[in-house]
């Protein structure tokens, strides 16, 4: 799990938001990082440096994006995990290129893709003004 969190740009934050996750994922993280506070719902009074959202459908992206963006620190780390097309466990209307309109409309674009496990991929979103090399790919 530590290697995965390194890939996800986890920088040792003491408190993170992990939304809509399976219990097994929470348990694995809790065992590996026993001094980490994991919020399963956004605390509206807390600004997060690291938010990880599991979304099985576009509806999940639309549900969790507003609250995640509201509580994400300036240039905080925001990941959305979604089912792989090859997953035998999940079927989804999300993929690397589709289902992220609400994030794109808010100025957030997918910049990095990481494999979580056999069922999940994770896509990191970053606000356009913090993306170093845009080369016409993203609107400014």
Per-region residue spans from a language model:
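C-terminal substrate-binding/active-site "lid" region of AdoMet-derived donor-dependent transferases
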Residues: 81-123
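Conserved class I S-adenosyl-L-methionine
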Residues: 8-21
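Flexible, glycine-/basic-rich loop-and-beta segments that form/coincide
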Residues: 128-140
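A short, conserved alpha-helix within the catalytic core of class I
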Residues: 58-66
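Short, charged/polar "capping" segments at the starts of alpha-helices
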Residues: 23-29, 87-90
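Short glycine-centered segments of the SAM/dcSAM-binding site in methyltransferase folds
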Residues: 15, 76-77
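Short acidic low-complexity segments
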Residues: 37-48
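Helix-to-beta-strand junctions that scaffold the AdoMet/dcAdoMet cofactor pocket
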Residues: 72-74
């Amino acid at each position: 799990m530590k290697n995965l969190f390194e890939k996800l740009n986890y920088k040792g934050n003491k408190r993170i938001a992990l939304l809509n996750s399976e219990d097994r994922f929470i348990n694995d993280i809790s065992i590996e990082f026993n001094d980490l506070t994991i919020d399963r719902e956004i605390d509206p009074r807390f600004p997060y440096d690291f938010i990880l959202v599991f979304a099985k459908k576009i509806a999940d992206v639309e549900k969790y994006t507003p609250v995640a963006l509201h509580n994400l620190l300036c240039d905080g780390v925001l990941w959305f995990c979604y089912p792989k097309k090859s997953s035998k466990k999940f079927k989804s209307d999300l993929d690397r290129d589709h289902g992220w309109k609400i994030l794109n409309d808010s100025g957030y674009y997918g910049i990095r893709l990481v494999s979580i496990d056999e069922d999940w991929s994770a896509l990191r979103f970053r606000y356009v003004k913090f993306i170093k090399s845009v080369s016409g790919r993203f609107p400014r």
